[in-house]
């Protein structure tokens, strides 16, 4: 599955984001630019998409992404908007990134992640669907169904987002 890349308006550097503490308490509103530049903690959602036979949808991010451009990811997702619930953010990200609406989401849990690039508290969801997918927002350049047995091979051969690997893969059902 290949796509064309277009700029996504909601990823503007001037978009407002909630800076939070690790308990999830909102500290202040900051621009996305400031959040990225200073590595401020924020809320995110990850949605793993699995086929009925258990394959995982793995995708490559656009070169225009503000962090980890062109890297591969095991989940779609993004930053939670100010005042937005986890579930609403997850449904929005599925719609924006894959063109999926109305599919049930299974909540898999929350967790914190921190490295030298990013600091976040995220909710992880699972969506079981075969598609069809549309990549209209340009955040995804290609996508592949990957079996559970093939995931370790993919992880070793390509650059993957470390936050979703850490917070999503351990929560996936067997």
Positions of PLM-derived features:
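Acidic, metal-coordinating catalytic segment for phosphate/diphosphate chemistry
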Residues: 2-46, 52
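Nudix hydrolase/Nudix homology domain
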Residues: 2-3, 30-33, 70, 82, ...
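Extended, polar beta-sheet/loop recognition surfaces of beta-rich domains
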Residues: 15, 103, 120
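Short, well-ordered strand-loop elements centered on a beta-strand within folded domains, enriched
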Residues: 25-29, 54-60, 132-136
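A short, polar/proline- and glycine-enriched secondary-structure boundary/capping micro-motif
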Residues: 38-40, 67-71, 147
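A glycine-rich, hydrophobic loop/mini-helix early in the fold
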Residues: 44-76
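Beta-hairpin (beta-strand-turn-beta-strand) motif
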Residues: 52, 61-63, 77-79, 85, ...
